[in-house]
Structures are given as C-alpha cells and as structure tokens.
From Swiss-Prot:
Tissue spec: Testis.
Superkingdom of the source species: Eukaryota
One GO CC term, this protein: nucleosome
Record's protein name: Protamine-2
UniProt subunit comment: Interacts with TDRP.
UniProt keyword terms in alphabetical order: Chromosome, Developmental protein, Differentiation, DNA condensation, DNA-binding, Nucleosome core, Nucleus, Phosphoprotein, Spermatogenesis
Similarity remark: Belongs to the protamine P2 family.
UniProt source species: Callithrix jacchus
C-alpha cells in the first residue's frame, strides 16, 4: 500500500513558502518566460513531489468495489412503467435480463 504525503506550509520555512506563492502568481500573469527560472525550478521541484500525488489519487480496489456495489443496488429498483406495458407477459430467459446490470 502506498501512502501519499503532502507537505503543510508549517513544515517548511515561511520565506520559502512566500517565494513559492510569488512564483506561482508570476506564472499565472504571464510575466515570466516560458522556461522555469533556476530559483523557481528549484522550488517547483521541491513542491511538485508533494502535491502531484495529492491531486491524482488512483481508485483503490475497495473504492471501485463500493461504487460498483452501489450501482448494482440501484439497478434492482423497479422503474415505473406506463399502463399498457405493465401486464405484458415476459418473454425469454430471466437470466438474460439480469445480465444488463453486470456491464458497469
């Protein structure tokens, strides 16, 4: 199991954090050139490791199972049908009808 660690602002010196904020604002405003400056690149390299994993969190097996289970439960709810379709006898095998839910 992999644990992701995000650095909090309190862990690093306040000056370094202030530099990071200023560097990000410059990049957004388009004042800085396309390439990273030596100082900015260094700060980016340090923070990028911590925050990239925080942004992209992979779907765990347990979470996928939970999502799938929730969907299959909602499939079982009976949908209301209009009067003319209610009394129509079923045709074919019932197991075929169930298979529709397993696609998800």
């Amino acid at each position: 199991m992999v644990r992701y660690r995000v650095r909090s602002p309190s862990e690093r010196p306040h000056e370094e954090y202030r530099q990071l904020v200023n560097w990000q604002e410059q990049g957004r405003n388009g004042q800085e050139e396309q390439g990273l400056s030596a100082e900015g690149g260094e700060v980016y390299g340090r923070t990028h490791q911590g925050y990239s994993s925080y942004r992209r969190r992979r779907c765990s097996r347990r979470r996928r199972y939970r999502i799938h289970r929730r969907r299959s439960r909602s499939c079982r709810r009976r949908r209301r049908r209009s009067c003319r379709y209610r009394r129509r006898p079923r045709r074919g095998c019932r197991s075929r009808r169930r298979r529709r839910c397993r696609r998800y």
